[in-house]
Amino acid sequence: MINRVSINTVINLANAGGVCGWLLLIRPLIYLIFSRRRELNAYSSVDSSAVVFIFYAVFCFYFSIRVLQKQKSSFARDLLTKSPLIWFVVYTLFGVASIFWSVNTQLTGFRAFECLSMAILMVAILQNVFIQGGCRLAMQWTILYVVVDIVFSIFRALSYTTNIVELLQTSQMMATTFFYIALYQTRKKWWNYLIIAMSIFSMSTVAYIGMALGSISAFFGHAKYRVVVFIATFILGTAIAVIGPYSFVKNTVFFDKKTISIHETTGRDKIMDVAFQALDDRPLGYGFFAGEPYLLYSKNLGAINGHNSLFSAAIGLGIPGIVLISLFFILMWKIAFSRYIPSDYRASLIGCFIVSFLQSMGNPGIGSRVFGGWLPTMFATVLICGFYVYGKYYEEIQDNDNE
């Protein structure tokens, strides 16, 4: 039952992120109003919709820098320099530099700036929430952000369908990325169940694999998590034994494909070939993001994105791009399991990272433009880095938070 008290609570929670928090929360609304479906060959066209998002990126960058300059805490600086985020920043700045050899200078420049703008916006938000309320508030704000995105995604989907199955798939990348946070953290409310339901019915093969692998997070949390995983594993193992491994995989992971094969990966194998060829042809790449639609459209692959962080890096920024993005992910794996992340939150964040990593390896994500899985995977990354920095360098604040 929604009442005035609950509305005020939500508003107060949103306010914890400051102006930057509101800018991120209204993005799904802006997307709902101004986004449009484009032909593949119109990926670089500038219309009223594109102008809105250009202004939005500029506003985000301006207010983020302003907030970071005014804040006395060094949390944001530590987050950007003492965590794997520094390699993402270097990767993105290299993307900006690629305007000098890009096949589309304007497209590369804007998309790289947009990535930098949104990343700094998230850093500013998490600085606000960590300094104000510590780990608990950071988790609560994250849940709010995910739910807001889901709600607006459903509203957008209602413009072209009322099929409940299709509606449950509208925020598959956002919901599944934060599945383990909804499962493990905060008191179970309708919003937790909404995220869990959207994840279960997402019909995303990549997400299902990520969620399955993410179950190892249970071994880093409370004993009750391990019991749940044991029961789920027992049920799953029994089902596989009864149905048979081939039939099980065919009817789940490859449920909409003719056979189990790398060639049934909706064209990702062909995109991989394009990425390898791009490395041969241009070791420095074709320019951040611009190279992806330029090559993939010319190959008639029906995509403008590499659907894999490494493929995107290879096509856009060549060998240096692969090195930088690989270093970023390797260090993210290291800190996701770090002892500096408070034990009460470690399981949630390990599960969250594993799903986000799989999203980046199988969907549009980190390494390319702000699209598809980029926002959830980037927010998950900044969140995990925030917990790491908070636990390692802000022990006094952490002690107060635990009290």
State what each model feature region is:
Residues 219-260, 273-278:
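A membrane-periplasm/extracellular boundary helix in multi-pass inner-membrane enzymes
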Residues 10-17, 79-92, 107, 112-116, ...:
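Interfacial loop-to-transmembrane-helix boundary motif in multi-pass membrane proteins
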Residues 72, 82-85, 317-357, 390-398:
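Hydrophobic transmembrane alpha-helices and their immediate junctions
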Residues 257-317:
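Long extracytoplasmic/lumenal interhelical loops at the membrane interface
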Residues 19-22, 346-359, 365-403:
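Transmembrane alpha-helices of multi-pass inner-membrane enzymes
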Residues 59, 96, 117-160, 164-222, ...:
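Alpha-helical transmembrane segments of multi-pass inner-membrane proteins
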Residues 1-67, 95-101, 152, 356-361:
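N-terminal signal-anchor transmembrane segment
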Residues 44-54, 110-112, 160-177, 204, ...:
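Membrane-interface micro-motifs in multi-pass membrane enzymes
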